[in-house]
Amino acid sequence: MIEAHRLSKQFGTFHAVRAIDLEVRPGELLALLGPNGAGKTTTVRMLGAILRPSSGSARICGLDVVTDAQTIRGKVGLLTEYPGLYGRMIATEYLDFFGSLLGLDVATREARTDLLLQQFGLWDARERKLDGYSKGMKQKIALVRALIHDPPVLFLDEPTTAMDPQSARTVRDAIGELRQADRAILLTTHNLAEAELLADRIAIIRGGQIIALGTFAELSRQLLGAPIYELRLAVPHNIAPAVPALADLITVEDASGQTLRYRCTEPNLINPQLLARLAARNLPVVALAEVPRSLEDVYLRIVAEDAAAPKQPPVPHQEALAANEVLQQLIEADL
């Protein structure tokens, strides 16, 4: 449902996004991660037909983001980091207004509004002005707005920003349910635990380029190498004398006392051989397990590489340039 081929965006001499290729299938959630300024939001704006690409192509539900921009805007739900609400309106009026802009009839608007306000715990605040909402409540209203027309494609840019833990959990649970409804979802977030929990696949962007794309397991192996295992012997045995006899099987990371840490590319094949060799030396193994690795480990490796990489020179007022371009496109579209 979401396809991008060599999609690029340039502001003057600054390349914000460089020839990225992406695909998000129905029922899939792809998390787009990267440092600040990596190109995440620019990518979302282009895919959402808000910002025109400089080159390359993208299609949403088979529609081109340039030639079919107005049609696409009716098929996507977009949640940005900053909600941009009309604070003087009450919640129900606000949602009814946006539903009418999207062409929903009165009965559908009312039904969708009631359903979503209850789902996100905002029912009791439905007649309050949005100015009186907390930051977390405003973000939830913005998510309801993105879902009001039941779109097949969702772009979620930092959806749980400023939310308390309970509200964030409510939103994460809802996102999981939305994915099960065969929606294609692109999520950008700095919450690595959230991405690890929700994403089917993860793309990591740096300097406007996708530098890694795959499942968490695939990225862990690609960026962190083969998995690490930890083996412990019974006290008082010592692992060190046995290490030379294991060198052809494993790559030793650390060996001290009763504990051995090692990398192993084919654990189902190698670990039984390893245990057999230790047993032959009368070294009793009391524990053997893979050392857990998190998405944070993967992300920190990327950030470390980013810090060492050459940077493009900064462009003054880059955000203003982007905002002006978006405004010009909306004027041209007569919106």
Annotate each predicted stretch with a short phrase:
Residues 5, 232, 289-291:
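Solvent-exposed beta-strand sheet faces enriched in polar/charged residues
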Residues 55, 71, 93, 108, ...:
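An acidic, carboxylate-rich microenvironment
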Residues 267-335:
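C-terminal coupling/interaction segments
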Residues 172-265:
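ABC transporter nucleotide-binding domain
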Residues 71, 119-120, 263, 298-301:
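Short secondary-structure transition/capping segments
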Residues 2-4, 9-207, 211-212:
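ABC transporter nucleotide-binding domains
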